[in-house]
Amino acid sequence: MLFRSVKGDIYEGLLEKNAQDTKSGAGQYFTPRVLIDAIVQVMRAQPGTAIIDPAAGTGGFLLSAASHILKDYKLDRDQVRHLQTQALYAVELVASTARLCAMNLLLHGLGNEKNIAAGKDSLAFRPSANYDMVLTNPPFGKKSSVTIINRDGDEVKERQEILRDDFWATTSNKQLNFLQHVRSLLKINGRAAIVLPDNVLFEGGAGETVRKRLLHDCDVHTLLRLPTGIFYAQGVKANVLFFDRKPASETRSPAPTWTTLSAAITPRIATSELKPSASGPSPTKT
């Protein structure tokens, strides 16, 4: 396990260096480690927690969650086996990036082929299971589109709206769709942390509908405003939204949301605002 971890750390370091050195390519799939670790620490995953990243990239959130569980708890043999094989789930649309994710997890002694969905569009289908925790940084880019070939043989991009009966609004906005998808992935009392750009906070129409329903159906307790430039794409204004899925009997008028602007990402962010999950140890089939 230790030897695997050393090789894994070297491999992850190479991924991070490539993300820093490349304007396109790995950088679009790599979330800065300091941000990942801060989010994971305040979320406080426990042994037995079923965790999914529906836009996994190279697997940084899942690796960090596993690392924090191993560091914070003394696990017995069954708990270690569960963490290695049943606790972490990844979905990644880009097949080559999914292979990087699989290698990253396997070099750290984590995951298996059943837990990594490669080349799958998270947004295309309603979830077949629910999870205790969702940690994710969906790819930035406002609109979803598909490339088609027209009669002249030219490639044309067309806007793609996601039609799902578990979504509150139909829209081509990828971030709004990911936000709705994350809510659908959660068990009752499950918890989520999702990185989102500013357009999700202020867009009208479908954006307003999604925000109202999220505030009504979930406990949206914390919004962390990130400093500009934390991502490799310059000028991107981003936020981390923390929320818990409430039982239907507890839906009510929205409670106040705690908001902060962080000049420096540290592991102490909002630790008093987050509550441990009361959900069971594994994904629930639906």
Q: Which residues does each PLM region occupy?
A:
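Non-catalytic, mostly N-terminal accessory regions of nucleic-acid modification and defense proteins
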Residues: 1-47, 113-122, 225-229, 250-255, ...
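A generic structural signal for residues located within well-ordered alpha-helices
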Residues: 6, 31, 96, 174, ...
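Charged, low-complexity, helix-prone segments enriched in Lys/Glu/Asp/Gln
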Residues: 18, 69, 83-85, 280-284
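Short glycine- and Lys/Arg-enriched binding-loop motifs that mark or flank ligand-binding interfaces
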Residues: 23, 53-56, 186, 231
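Conserved S-adenosyl-L-methionine
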Residues: 25-136, 140-145, 150-154, 176, ...
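A conserved structural/catalytic subdomain of Rossmann-like adenosyl-cofactor enzymes
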Residues: 125-286
